Amino acid sequence: LGAGDDTFVWDPGDGSDVVEGQAGLDTMDFNGANVAENIDISANGGRAVLFRDIAAITMDLNDVETIRFDALGGADTVRVRDLSGTDVTTVRIDLAALGGGGDGASDTIVLDATGGDDVVQVVTDGASIRVLGLAAEVVI
């Protein structure tokens, strides 16, 4: 990506990628599929990694500040690990099905704390739940 605020979009059928965000506030928008997916977001040194079990997709991210996962249906499990040391400040998880409604499937979100002493706050903000106090804010 170039300098400035950029958005990189991943859709089912795309392969694994390395994303270099560079300057500005950059976002990776990762679109899921209407199947049960396992998504794992973690740190690898100063880089962030998003792994999707369906098709063994790995997104290797540097200088990306926001990761947005749109589930689009299915009984999904999303795990956000300690993102300390990465540039990620916000992880947004949208569990709505295609078209914006619910799909009746049970989703699971697991958030890992950092290696230090954490004071975690869970607050509602309209229709969203915000988790504050971890390495990155998580908005569900």
Task: List where the protein language model places each region.
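Acidic, glycine-rich low-complexity segments
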Residues: L1-I140
